[in-house]
Amino acid sequence: MHNFKSTPPADSLSDDFTSCSEWCRKMWEETFDDAYIKLYELWKSRGQ
């Protein structure tokens, strides 16, 4: 384990982790939505 700064208190660490995981989930959902829309439009245009 590399400690670049002194270990933060447990509550601040869990706050950072929560906000990071929420951000990651939001980014993932937005990326997935974009990809799904593109795939759906491609499928729809090929079906016609």
UniProtKB/Swiss-Prot annotation:
Source organism, top-level taxon: Viruses
Protein's organism: Escherichia phage T7 (Bacteriophage T7)
Protein name: Protein 1.8
